[in-house]
Amino acid sequence: MIGNKHYQEVFARQMYNYKNVFDPSVGFMRGKGLDGKWQEPFDPLEWGGPFCEGNAWHYTWSVFHDVEGLIDLFGSDQKFTIKMDSVFTLPSTIKPGTYGGVIHEMKEMELAGMGQYAHGNQPIQHMPYLYSYAGQPWKTQYWVRQIVERLYNATERGYPGDEDQGGMSSWYILSSLGIYAVCPGTDEYVIGSPLFKKATITLENGNKFV
């Protein structure tokens, strides 16, 4: 679509719409009604409603293409990272909300025991890498290594969720190599915590990336 003015204008209008669903008074993305007003009541732990298979703790970080803009909504790097810290330190409380009962994504989050971090579903999988955008790459490295070692293993509980479009395995492979594309389709990768001293990737043209 390079050079297509129509789609350029469409995406230019849409790419910053996430700012319209961020409520600074509560520090979360949240749903709005047809009248443009915030949906009430609001509980960031409650699943469903405006969120598919997740809650506000999961979807607030889903701004893959403009992380700097997301950080600005919180007011500073420090406020942003403090909020991310809370994801891991909160209890793994489940509130089914509009689902009316526990679905497997909820149970996977509970079993993981990493607070409100729900690695079993895609919306929050990139979140540990966002520390690097806010000046705390060591937290990216720490939490990525925790996820790799605690949630993946060679047992019946060694795969932490659905393999939707290859997301679960590709997260592990890239994170094990020490790189991750927060915004897929770009040539930008965040450095994480590699498991190997050396790795060689054979590209489709036969070249080697070492």
Q: Where do the PLM segments sit?
A:
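Active-site core of glycosidic bond-cleaving carbohydrate-active enzymes
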Residues: 1-195, 199-208
